[in-house]
Swiss-Prot record:
ATP binds at S9, F10, H17, G89, L90, R91, E99, D124, S125, F126, I127, S128, S129, S130. Homohexamer. Substrate binds at S9, K41, T74, R88. Belongs to the bacterial CoaD family. Its cofactor is Mg(2+). The keyword DNA repair does not apply. The keyword Cytoplasm applies. Keywords: ATP-binding, Coenzyme A biosynthesis, Cytoplasm, Magnesium, Nucleotide-binding, Nucleotidyltransferase, Transferase. This is Phosphopantetheine adenylyltransferase. Reversibly transfers an adenylyl group from ATP to 4'-phosphopantetheine, yielding dephospho-CoA (dPCoA) and pyrophosphate. It comes from Lactobacillus gasseri (strain ATCC 33323 / DSM 20243 / BCRC 14619 / CIP 102991 / JCM 1131 / KCTC 3163 / NCIMB 11718 / NCTC 13722 / AM63). It comes from the Bacteria.
Amino acid sequence: MTKAIFPGSFDPITNGHAEVVEAAARMFEKLYVVIMTNTSKKYLFDEKERLDLAKKVFENDKNIEVIARPAELTVEVAHELNAGAIVRGLRNTTDFNYERDIAGINKTLDPKLNTVLLFTRPEDSFISSSMIKETVFFGGNVSTLVPKPVAAALEEKLRNQNNEEK
């Protein structure tokens, strides 16, 4: 069975992420969406919330499993799951340069583990989790940029934060 992992912080999952997951799920018999930690990011959703949201987004996909591995190296997660590939999504050349460097580190750690890069659609190439959070923070509507469960969770999170500030 060909297995792959799609690691990320997914704070929150965007339509671009979902698009890459769906494309990868057609390429591999089993795809693990792995909720991980990026130490350089400030999170809006905690690990459990990110895990639950991802599970909701992909609940109808039989060959996709969502798991959390917040304190492990990507290569170690791939080994643990017997995955032969790491899937990463690209929006632009900035992403390419970043992902090339990560793929190089991963290849150094495990020369047999490959990275598969998938491009998002041009209409999704500007979407980033950071921009989504910023837009929501200032009251913008992102419902066309994220899956429905994510849009609802963002609205609720914003409402709760606004209530706490009052």
